[in-house]
Structure formats: structure tokens, C-alpha cells
Amino acid sequence: MKTRLIIFLMCLFAWFSGADTHAQTDVKHLSWGKVANNMPTEWYNSEQARNIADQLLARQMDCGGWQKNIPYHHLLTDAELAKVRRTGVGATIDNGATTTEMRFLARVYACCGDARYKDAFVKGLHYLFEAQYDNGGWPQFNPPRGKAHYSSHITYNDNAMVNVLRLLREVSENDSPFDGLRLSDSLREQAQKSFDKGIDCILKTQIRIDGKPTVWCAQHDEKTFAPAPARAYELVSFSGS
């Protein structure tokens, strides 16, 4: 009996040691996209993942979106967090921003059930709804980066709209990891309607030559649907990017 108890305690100690080691995985060398989407499922229940989620809450802009090209898994100090700007221009769907952060929060919430993470996700979802034009398209930034700036164009470049549409479809169909959020039927229905409008916009912006549908530009004018330029080297073209 004593031998069995010793073996049990040794196994229990080994399990906790292994869990702690796994929870403190070195993620700094990984990309933010990898950390947000491709870690082992159990890792999203770790203290390390929750610390990152807490940073996402602190760095979510007041409009509900997030800024781009930021390695959110590199944690800031309290002093640095106090200087983070949460208002004005900055929230975007460019380069995977906002949708990536929402996916991460959904995964962490599914594991730990902290309501703050769900609330932040829902706030991000409303940001996507509000940023969508009546014609179904999304600008690169919302609010846009200045008057007559290309960031107000309907943006396909860098999978901006595709990332949003994919997330909305998965939310509406209650796919993983969003099923763990237990979103209301009304929210999922709104996601479906937003998705449908987005698909309709894609059809409207397709370039037609002699009445025949062809391809798309990287961005299109939000009012006329015509191909539109962006940066100086991103001219109107029959291209994807």
C-alpha cells in the first residue's frame, strides 16, 4: 500500500512539473499569429496565455479593434501599458489585425471561462459590424487614416476582407473555437448577414470587360466599386496585390 502511494505521489509530481514547464513555453521567438492560432489546445488554459489575454484587453482600442503589426505576446510592463493609446486612428483589419486577437481571446475563453475575454471578443465583433459599409465592404482602417486616404477603400489586399469573412462565417456556424463562447443566436445571425453582405460586395466589385466578369484589384473605391490605387507603387490594376 505504501509503495503504491509513493508511486502515485511521484507520478503526480511529474505531471505537475510537466504542466508547469508546458505552461511557461518560450513564445517570444514565435510569431504572434502562431501563438494566437497554433499552440496546443491545453496551452490556452495556461497562466501564460491568460497573461497575454489580459494584455489584449488593455490594448484593445475603445472602438473595439486592435492595431496591426504588434507582437502582443511580448508583454508590456504596467508603466508601458499606461502609455498605450486607445483612441483615435489605429484599429484595422490589415495584416490580420483584430481578427487574430479575437481568435486568441476565443481560445482562451473556451479554456478558462473568464467573462472579460468574451466581452472583449464581442466588442471586437461589433467593431467589425460597425466598420462594414452599407454596400458590404470593409475599409482597411476604421476610422480611416485621414480625409481621402486609401485606407477608406474596400480592401482585399493582404486578405483583409477575407480574414473578416472567414471569422464571421465560423462565428455564424458556431465553429471552433467560437462555439466555446456560446454566443447568442442574434449575434450569430448578425454575423451571417454581415458575411452575406460581404460576399455580395465581392461580386459587385468584380472587374467586367465587355460585360464579362474577370478579376479584382487589391482595393476598390468604396462608392463606385472601381479599382482604386493605394500606396505610390500600388496602382490601379487587374491583380490581387
Residue ranges of model-derived segments:
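Carbohydrate-binding/catalytic loop surfaces
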Residues: 71-89, 139-159, 212-239
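Bacterial N-terminal signal peptides
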Residues: 7-17
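Long, well-ordered core segments of solenoidal/helical folds
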Residues: 52-64, 120-137, 192-211
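Sec/Tat signal peptide C-region and signal peptidase I cleavage site
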Residues: 18-23
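Low-complexity, Ser/Thr/Pro/Gly-enriched N-terminal "stalk/linker" regions
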Residues: 24-88, 209-212
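Aromatic- and histidine-enriched alpha-helix N-cap/loop-to-helix transition segments
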Residues: 44-48, 92-100, 155-166, 190, ...
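Eukaryote-skewed repeat-based solenoidal scaffolds used as protein-protein interaction platforms
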Residues: 118, 125, 129, 154, ...
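Well-ordered alpha-helical scaffold segments within catalytic/enzyme domains
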Residues: 31-44, 52, 57-58, 99-114, ...
